[in-house]
Amino acid sequence: MAVPKKRTSISKKRIRKNIWKKKGYWAALKAFSLGKSLSTRNSKSFFYPTNK
């Protein structure tokens, strides 16, 4: 049966947790930025219907 040999230090655990949190932060920031550009119609990668 596989068992870890030593306990992970608190500092290493904290570093890994912060990396994990930072990934979520950047994903949320990108989503917010995309939503903002869509709402202001400044996005260059989406086509908007023109009402004439």
From Swiss-Prot:
<dbReference type="InterPro" id="IPR011332">
    <property type="entry name" value="Ribosomal_zn-bd"/>
</dbReference>
<comment type="similarity">
    <text>Belongs to the bacterial ribosomal protein bL32 family.</text>
</comment>
<keyword id="KW-0934">Plastid</keyword>
<dbReference type="GO" id="GO:0003735">
    <property type="term" value="F:structural constituent of ribosome"/>
</dbReference>
<dbReference type="GO" id="GO:0015934">
    <property type="term" value="C:large ribosomal subunit"/>
</dbReference>
<keyword id="KW-0689">Ribosomal protein</keyword>
<protein>
    <recommendedName>
        <fullName>Large ribosomal subunit protein bL32c</fullName>
    </recommendedName>
</protein>
<keyword id="KW-0150">Chloroplast</keyword>
<keyword id="KW-0687">Ribonucleoprotein</keyword>
<dbReference type="GO" id="GO:0006412">
    <property type="term" value="P:translation"/>
</dbReference>
<dbReference type="Pfam" id="PF01783">
    <property type="entry name" value="Ribosomal_L32p"/>
</dbReference>
<dbReference type="GO" id="GO:0009507">
    <property type="term" value="C:chloroplast"/>
</dbReference>
<dbReference type="InterPro" id="IPR044958">
    <property type="entry name" value="Ribosomal_bL32_plant/cyanobact"/>
</dbReference>
<dbReference type="InterPro" id="IPR002677">
    <property type="entry name" value="Ribosomal_bL32"/>
</dbReference>
